[in-house]
């Protein structure tokens, strides 16, 4: 997390929709980065970003923290919502840290995750992060990974991560490979059981 915020030049606007995982707010404070909170709104029981508000407050070349599926609200953004967001990103040239760690753990069968970076018009604005830890219950094994299409951003991220973020270890790599190659039946059973707890 620190290696991400270290990428952001000082005095650059960082927009963080709230509520959010608390460390996303703590890290920039320790690095003396300025955060602009964007309170999310309740849209028929879904906690979502107010895109009109985002468009009005976002400055050119700002950064956005985006979480999809949203944590703690659980909202899975629709493809239409992702496209609406992408227009703002393109218009303002916003760079986005996209936390998509829960993308494989969606309990409602009628909902589908759309990766923000899958939209070609903005793919080079997106640093997307994934992990097997949430869905496959393997936290602590250093098996998260990033998808960063922009060469300059990817090089800067790797450089900033040196000495801050540990490299992947062999145990984590094996766990990641096993989860994504052989863990889907287990994931499906997990979703079936977890779905019974929805109210």
Named regions from a protein language model:
Residues 36, 41-111:
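Active-site phosphate-binding strand-loop segment of PLP-dependent enzymes
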């Amino acid at each position: 997390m620190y290696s991400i915020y270290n990428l952001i030049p000082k005095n650059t606007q960082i927009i963080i929709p709230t509520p959010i995982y608390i460390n996303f707010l703590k890290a920039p404070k320790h690095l003396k980065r300025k955060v602009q909170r964007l309170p999310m709104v309740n849209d028929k029981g879904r906690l979502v970003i107010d895109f009109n508000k985002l468009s009005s407050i976002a400055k050119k070349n700002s950064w956005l923290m985006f979480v999809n599926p949203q944590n703690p609200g659980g909202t899975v953004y629709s493809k239409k919502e992702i496209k609406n967001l992408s227009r703002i990103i393109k218009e303002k040239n916003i760079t986005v840290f996209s936390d998509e760690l829960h993308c494989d753990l969606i309990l409602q069968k009628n909902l589908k995750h759309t990766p923000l970076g899958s939209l070609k018009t903005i793919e080079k604005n997106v640093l997307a992060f994934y992990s097997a830890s949430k869905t496959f219950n393997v936290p602590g094994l250093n098996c998260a990974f990033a998808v960063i299409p922009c060469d300059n951003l990817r090089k800067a991220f790797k450089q900033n991560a040196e000495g801050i973020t540990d490299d992947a270890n062999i145990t984590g790599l094996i766990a990641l490979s096993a989860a994504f190659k052989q863990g889907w039946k287990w994931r499906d059973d997990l979703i079936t059981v977890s779905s019974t707890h929805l109210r």
